[in-house]
């Protein structure tokens, strides 16, 4: 296999893990593109992205254009004479002229099994929908949003205890291996391209804080999926006496209840059981305002009065029952 001259474009830690795999591979990373440095921390000092930091550690040229629609930025990229551009969570739109610049085009690492979940939040939407598996797709980029031909897929079962956080970590391990495998196939010309079936496509919209409000009229199983999908952000929550209480972990109880949805049925060290629109949800880890996430057992030691059986919890932040 002849090593490829690769431009890598990415920004967060997830992308940096893929860059490290390329650095460790037979291919040559000739340049890195990443978002401009952003103010961070209390002092609001400019901070380099994880991808930039890794590139500088390895003496790789770094480019940080504000936009790739700029003709000078496009000319700068073209002058690199890359074989291929690898894009992982970059954050900038790549116009067609950029997609067509490298000899073999641009490929993307996408955190789902396409075309099931296109868009910004495929990990979270897969959990919320109750999917039993997810994975990584290596895709040839085109001008659409995650609509390009699929080059390689890897599958990952979704376990009952998975959250968006744990799936992120698993896919961050799986993705780099898939990327290096795909590049080997591309270099050898042995990787067939597969068209996406548009009838199977869904759009994974970015999450919002509003979506994370718990609605007790939903089935317990749906709330359980939401809580896992919104961990670690924006975190499922409900309001009680003007306080936002975040819910980090839960389970679906074997109990049944005819009580009004939102009614606290029991509260002990094993969890807080709440009636829902269908079934009973047991909360096992929560976070009170200004505090860190704690087990229900620890929270009941200090605020048992907030979780008295018979209390009916509101489903929105503007109404208390």
Curated annotation (Swiss-Prot):
Annotated PROSITE patterns: GART
GO molecular function: methionyl-tRNA formyltransferase activity
InterPro entries assigned: Fmt, Formyl_trans_C, Formyl_trans_C_sf, Formyl_transf_N, Formyl_transf_N_sf, Formyl_transferase-like_C_sf, GART_AS, Met-tRNA-FMT_C
EC number: 2.1.2.9
Keywords: Protein biosynthesis, Transferase
CDD domains tied to this protein: FMT_core_Met-tRNA-FMT_N, Met_tRNA_FMT_C
Binding site for (6S)-5,6,7,8-tetrahydrofolate: 112-115
Source organism superkingdom: Bacteria
Coiled coil segments of this chain: none
Pfam families: Formyl_trans_C, Formyl_trans_N
A single GO cellular-component term on record: cytosol
Top-level enzyme category: transferase
Known catalytic reactions: L-methionyl-tRNA(fMet) + (6R)-10-formyltetrahydrofolate = N-formyl-L-methionyl-tRNA(fMet) + (6S)-5,6,7,8-tetrahydrofolate + H(+)
PANTHER family noted in UniProt: METHIONYL-TRNA FORMYLTRANSFERASE, METHIONYL-TRNA FORMYLTRANSFERASE, MITOCHONDRIAL
Function: Attaches a formyl group to the free amino group of methionyl-tRNA(fMet). The formyl group appears to play a dual role in the initiator identity of N-formylmethionyl-tRNA by promoting its recognition by IF2 and preventing the misappropriation of this tRNA by the elongation apparatus.
Similarity section: Belongs to the Fmt family.
Protein name: Methionyl-tRNA formyltransferase
Organism for this UniProt entry: Shewanella pealeana (strain ATCC 700345 / ANG-SQ1)
Gene symbol of the encoding locus: fmt
């Amino acid at each position: 296999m002849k090593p490829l001259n690769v431009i890598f474009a990415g920004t967060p830690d997830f992308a940096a893990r893929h860059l490290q795999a390329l650095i460790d591979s037979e291919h040559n990373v000739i340049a890195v593109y990443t978002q401009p440095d952003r103010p961070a921390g209390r002092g609001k000092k400019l901070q380099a992205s994880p991808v930039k930091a890794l590139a500088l550690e390895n003496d790789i040229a770094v480019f940080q254009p504000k936009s790739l629609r700029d003709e000078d930025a496009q000319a700068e990229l073209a002058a690199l004479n890359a074989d291929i551009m690898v894009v992982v969570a970059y954050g900038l739109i790549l116009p067609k002229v950029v997609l067509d610049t490298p000899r073999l085009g641009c490929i993307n690492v996408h955190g789902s099994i396409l075309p099931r979940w296109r868009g910004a939040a495929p990990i979270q939407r897969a959990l919320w929908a109750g999917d039993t598996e997810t994975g990584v797709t290596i895709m040839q980029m085109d001008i659409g949003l995650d609509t390009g031909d699929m080059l390689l897929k890897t599958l990952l079962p979704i376990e009952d205890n998975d959250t968006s956080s744990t799936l992120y970590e698993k896919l961050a391990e799986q993705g780099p291996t898939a990327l290096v495998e795909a590049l080997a196939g591309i270099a050898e010309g042995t990787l067939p391209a597969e068209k996406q079936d548009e009838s199977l496509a869904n759009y994974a919209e970015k999450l919002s804080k509003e979506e994370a409000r718990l609605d007790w009229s939903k089935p317990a199983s749906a709330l359980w999926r939401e809580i896992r999908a919104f961990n670690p952000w924006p975190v499922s929550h409900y309001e009680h006496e003007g306080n936002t209480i975040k819910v980090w972990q839960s389970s679906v109880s074997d109990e049944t209840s005819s009580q009004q949805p939102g009614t606290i049925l029991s509260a002990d060290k094993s969890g807080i059981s709440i009636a829902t629109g269908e079934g009973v949800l047991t909360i096992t880890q929560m976070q009170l305002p200004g505090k860190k996430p704690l087990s229900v057992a620890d929270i009941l030691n200090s605020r048992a009065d907030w979780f008295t059986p018979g209390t009916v919890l509101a489903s929105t932040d503007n109404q208390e029952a």
